[in-house]
A protein has these predicted regions:
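ANL superfamily adenylate-forming
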Residues: 2-37, 145-147
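Conserved pre-ATP/AMP-binding loop-to-beta segment of ANL
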Residues: 26-45, 52, 75-81
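Conserved AMP-binding A3 loop
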Residues: 41-65
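Conserved AMP-binding/adenylation subdomain of ANL enzymes
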Residues: 64-81, 89-130, 140, 144-148
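Gly/Ser/Thr-rich phosphate-binding loop
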Residues: 128-133, 142-207, 220, 227-230
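AMP-binding/adenylate-forming core of the ANL superfamily
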Residues: 222, 233-243
Length: 243
């Protein structure tokens, strides 16, 4: 949990968790690292676009820009508690669950390993206000809530909305979350190479089923042919992204 004075507070919601070991060097001053905006920050390995794993190198500017855009689009605040059930080595979890949350001074409620019951218990205990998850998580959580409707009361009025990516979320799952938890799940599009968020449905414009929404601030998108020439509106082609 980042706080405004630059320190970090850690809250543990799992009673059986082992205590954290003390860090004796916490008061030792460290020389600041000299980092340029375009210096590599992370290399995320992905096979999403080619089928074979490759490293996508993202700069500090890439990551910071995408995190700040997510804060603006989703309206994260320091009062939010973000569900941290996605792996943080994955672009979605790293940017939306962690980096954007830190940029907003929000809290991240971490879940070491996803199971529907453990996830729902964490959402209840930590009073999670924003869900960030992939469709399989939303599907399994909706199924559990349908079986145990008494647990839905904890989500109504606490969870503001959900964020979904990775693949399309079926319309019946959208409807189930709205009915069970009064929660709108917004879908978007991205890939590891783009830090990762390119576009998203946004509360300001409403959720359009079957759509990946509007392009994020600071991102430009064009549809071009195989020769790199821009295609007219309504024509198919390759999606070119920069930001």
């Amino acid at each position: 949990v980042p706080v405004k004075n630059g320190s970090v507070r850690c809250e543990i919601f799992e009673p059986s968790a082992s205590p954290l070991a003390p860090f004796d060097g916490v008061d030792v001053p460290l020389a600041p690292a000299v980092v340029k905006e375009q210096d590599p920050a992370v290399i995320l390995y992905t096979s999403g676009t080619t089928g074979r794993p490759k490293g996508a190198t993202l700069s500090h500017a890439n990551i910071l820009s995408n995190a700040r855009s997510c804060v603006k689009v989703f309206g994260f605040t320091a009062e939010d508690v973000i569900f941290g059930g996605l792996p943080l080595f994955h672009a979605f979890g790293q940017t939306v669950s962690m980096n954007a949350a830190f940029a907003a001074c929000a809290t991240v409620a971490l879940l070491p390993r996803f199971t529907p019951d453990h996830a729902l218990s964490l959402i209840e205990a930590a009073r999670v206000s924003v869900l960030a998850a992939v469709p399989s998580m939303y599907i399994s959580l909706a199924a559990l809530m349908a079986e145990q409707p008494e647990r839905c009361a904890h989500l109504r009025g606490t969870v503001r909305f959900g964020i979904s990516g990775g693949s399309a979320l079926p319309a019946p799952v959208h409807e189930a979350w709205k009915e069970l938890a009064d929660c709108t799940v917004y879908e978007g599009y991205g890939l590891s190479e783009t830090s990762p968020v390119v576009s998203f449905n946004q509360a300001a414009f409403g959720m359009v089923l079957g759509s990946v929404g509007r392009v994020l601030p600071g991102v430009q998108v064009q549809v071009r042919d195989s020769a790199g020439v821009e295609r007219p509106t309504g024509e198919s082609g390759q999606l070119w992204v920069r930001g």
